[in-house]
Amino acid sequence: LIGEMDLALAQARFTIYGVAELYNDQEKKSDLVNEINIAKHTVTNRALEVVDKAMRLVGAKSLQRSNPLQRYYRDVRAGLHNPPMDDLTIKKLAETAIQQMTKN
């Protein structure tokens, strides 16, 4: 599980740093809506995976108030309720892909 957790963290890190680098490019900045939404989706869902696996490793003690994992669990779940929602991100990506296919 620890290797899987590290992999998920690396995926999230590379995604967010990649989008941040694109965002710093003034010419591309205005065209990054999908990329930013992908980053939010990826980072939130990878964080959920990591916290869930960490809690599985620790067991029931991970739910105790004194354990920071219970707070991390709540904090990362909050990302699911902040826009854009996962289903809207996926729908927008599909719409963009269809538009690009019909242009060509």
Model segments located where?
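Nucleic acid-contacting regions in RNA/DNA-associated proteins
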Residues: 52
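Short, hydrophobic/aliphatic alpha-helical segments
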Residues: 43-48, 73
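Glycine-rich phosphate/cofactor-binding loops in nucleotide/flavin-utilizing enzymes
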Residues: 61-104
